[in-house]
């Protein structure tokens, strides 16, 4: 009646490329103003908070990988990949220092101690660790949502589902 939008899901932008700097600036502006952006085929997937947090937490479970990054052992990685992984690890560390994430921190620390001395194989895969990770906050909260809400509100859950497909294959 008033002509004002009541649901941001009523808005759609169509661009030739979501990689264009102007499109990225618009997406950043909208998200800084608490308007979620959904772009299913963009490189933005790996820039999402929940994706970086998962990857950082997974890496913290394997301290030898982190040592390898710090020592420059992975010469096959491009500098931007090393920077990205470090960013994920720093985000995970920041998140784990928050008191509300104490249980997650304790669990990851336990796994890190187990994996640092690992000599053989385990009876679980990366995907198994990922699903266990989802039992802890903040991931449990991201996944405990009403699936009948708008697409922008379920993006973290959708991204975690997509990441579980990637890791599980």
Predicted segment positions?
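Conserved helicase C-terminal RecA-like lobe
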Residues: 27, 58-169
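Conserved motor-region signature of P-loop NTPase helicases/translocases
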Residues: 1-73, 148
């Amino acid at each position: 009646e008033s002509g004002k939008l009541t649901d941001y899901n009523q808005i759609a932008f169509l661009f030739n490329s979501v990689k264009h700097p102007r499109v990225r600036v618009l997406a950043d502006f909208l998200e800084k103003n608490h308007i979620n952006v959904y772009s299913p085929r963009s490189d933005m997937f790996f820039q999402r908070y929940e994706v970086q947090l998962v990857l950082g937490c997974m890496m913290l479970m394997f301290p030898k990988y982190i040592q390898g990054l710090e020592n420059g052992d992975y010469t096959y990685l491009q500098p931007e990949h090393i920077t990205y992984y470090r960013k994920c690890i720093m985000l995970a560390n920041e998140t784990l220092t928050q008191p509300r994430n104490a249980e997650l921190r304790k669990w990851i620390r336990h796994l890190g101690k187990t994996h640092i001395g690992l000599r053989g194989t385990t009876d679980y895969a990366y995907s198994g660790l990922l699903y266990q990770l989802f039992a802890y906050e903040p991931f449990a909260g991201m996944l405990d949502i009403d699936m009948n809400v708008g697409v922008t509100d379920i993006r973290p859950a959708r991204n975690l589902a997509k990441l579980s497909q990637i890791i599980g294959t």
